[in-house]
């Protein structure tokens, strides 16, 4: 069987590819004493993120001088997102309040005690670049019971000209799910609230 290696064949198969700069992050912030988070602002200020990863452990079972490998438990790595600091520092302030409600700085107390209170959903959406598709969602990952565990420092310096401050929030979460992969034309077809 002949192998085709034409550029035209490659371009037909790859089309435009998926662009890493076409994404959206939606964070379902806790409600209540934290005040009203501007969810839309946080979504716009998210400058970088990643599609979450997972790992399946391996159980090695000795058998007659060899190790037989059996699939183990699934684990989920930390997830982080970087945000541009808005003029009023509202996004940064809200994450700091969220962290403080999980465990306060001064009193070592928690305003949000139950995981269902401080653990929220985060949705990472991979979007379509093709304008004719209207920026449709290609795939969406929903992180369940996510909560921030750290807010990075923001470096300040006199020589930091022509820059906007950024900070990174690291999250822990229980697991992630992805939309329906059986949808037509490669679209996820999911509607995640």
Can you describe what each PLM-predicted range is?
Residues 1-193:
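Glycine-rich, low-complexity intrinsically disordered segments
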């Amino acid at each position: 069987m002949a192998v085709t290696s034409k550029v035209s064949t490659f371009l037909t198969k790859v089309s435009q590819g998926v662009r890493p700069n076409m994404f959206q992050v939606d964070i379902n912030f806790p409600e209540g004493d934290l005040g009203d988070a501007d969810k839309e602002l946080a979504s716009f200020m998210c400058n970088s993120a990643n599609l979450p990863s997972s790992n399946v452990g391996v159980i090695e079972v000795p058998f007659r001088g060899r190790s037989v490998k059996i699939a183990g438990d699934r684990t989920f790595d930390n997830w982080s997102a970087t945000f541009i600091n808005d003029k009023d520092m509202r996004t940064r302030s809200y994450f700091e309040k969220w962290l403080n409600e999980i465990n306060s700085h001064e009193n070592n107390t928690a305003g949000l005690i139950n995981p269902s209170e401080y653990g929220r959903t985060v949705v990472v959406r991979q979007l379509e670049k093709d304008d004719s598709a209207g920026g449709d969602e290609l795939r969406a990952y929903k992180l369940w019971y996510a909560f921030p565990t750290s807010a990075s420092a923001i470096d300040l310096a006199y020589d930091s000209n022509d820059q906007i401050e950024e900070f990174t929030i690291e999250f822990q979460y229980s697991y992630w799910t992805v939309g329906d992969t059986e949808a037509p034309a490669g679209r996820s077809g999911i509607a995640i609230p």
